[in-house]
Every structure is written in structure tokens, then in C-alpha cells.
């Protein structure tokens, strides 16, 4: 897997392999970042939160494109080690923090400051998107006019629009994966 664009374009990311791991495909990442850029994202002003980060392909792509900072939340030890190796090999370790903790525990706390882009990519079948979203929205994790991205299994029904004052901006399906992008209403 390679970084698609920006300062680290073409650089290889290590990935975690085995049951339960599914790194974001290149076409999914390209589509997602195109959707964000089409909606006016200015990377130099972005703090990015990658929840259930895995190998960190989304957060490292954001950093490569110029995001100011990224936080990665990943409780799996093997994946967290992969995140650390990727941060070092890309020269991005000074622009990110890796939280090797349970996502529900981390998001139950208040952040030091809100994030402009939050990506939530829970393991399929684990029923973690809704409780994580609840913590994120109640805890002040999302900046005004911030974007929330969900990478979930196609069959999962989620509609947080009214409950959390979000507006669905885009939705795409790739095989068994559905990408949804919401913006926070102000």
C-alpha cells in the first residue's frame, strides 16, 4: 500500500495482515480524499483523528497532504506497532500521536482541542460505530464545520444526521465497504 498524494507520495506503508484486518484500498482512499477536497478542505488547517486506525493509511494520507496533526487510536498491539513504524519511516512521528487504547475509552474523555476531520473505521461486525459516534459527538471532539467519515460494512444502517446535527454530504459503496461523509451543522 502506498501514499497517494502529497509530501510522502509513493512511499510504502506497512500493513497488518491476518483475520480482521482490512486496510483501506487505494481507490477508496482516493475517492474519500477527493470528496473532502471537493468540499473545500484546506489541509494546512486540519487536525485529523483516525479511530480504529489499523495501519493508519487514512491519517498518514492526511498528513502527507499537509494536515497539521493526526491522532491515531488503535488498541490492537500489532496494529499499533505498525502505526509507529509507519510514522517513523515516513518521517511523520513528530506530527502524530498513537494511542494504543480502546477507542470507546479514549473517546469518553474530552480532547485538548477539536478535530476538523474524524474518521471512524470500526471492525466489521463489532457494533462499535454508534457508541463511538455518541462519545465523539457528546465529548466535543468535532470542530464546527468539521467532517465525520465512516468506513463501514455496506449492510450497516446508520443515520446520525438529526440526532447529532450532521448533514450527509456524500456516500459511496465499494464492494462490501460503504464510505459516508457528514459535515457538522453550525
Name what the model sees in each region.
Residues 1-186:
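Class I S-adenosyl-L-methionine-dependent methyltransferase catalytic core
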Amino acid at each position: 500500500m502506498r501514499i497517494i498524494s502529497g509530501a510522502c507520495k509513493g512511499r510504502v506503508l506497512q500493513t497488518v495482515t491476518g483475520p480482521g484486518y482490512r486496510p483501506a484500498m487505494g481507490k477508496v482512499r482516493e475517492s474519500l480524499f477527493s470528496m473532502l477536497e471537493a468540499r473545500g478542505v484546506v489541509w494546512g488547517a486540519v487536525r485529523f483523528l483516525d479511530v480504529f486506525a489499523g495501519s493508519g493509511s487514512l491519517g498518514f494520507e492526511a498528513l502527507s497532504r499537509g494536515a497539521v496533526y493526526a491522532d491515531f487510536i488503535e488498541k490492537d498491539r500489532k496494529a499499533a506497532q505498525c502505526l509507529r513504524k509507519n510514522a517513523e519511516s515516513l518521517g511523520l512521528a513528530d506530527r502524530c500521536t498513537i494511542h494504543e487504547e480502546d477507542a470507546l475509552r479514549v473517546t469518553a474523555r474530552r480532547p485538548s482541542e477539536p478535530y476538523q476531520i474524524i474518521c471512524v473505521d470500526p471492525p466489521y461486525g463489532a457494533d462499535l460505530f454508534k457508541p463511538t459516534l455518541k462519545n465523539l459527538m457528546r465529548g466535543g471532539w468535532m470542530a464546527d464545520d468539521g467532517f465525520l467519515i465512516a468506513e463501514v460494512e455496506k449492510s450497516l444502517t446508520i443515520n446520525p444526521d438529526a440526532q447529532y446535527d450532521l448533514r450527509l454530504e456524500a456516500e459511496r459503496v465499494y464492494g462490501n465497504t460503504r464510505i459516508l461523509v457528514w459535515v457538522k451543522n453550525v
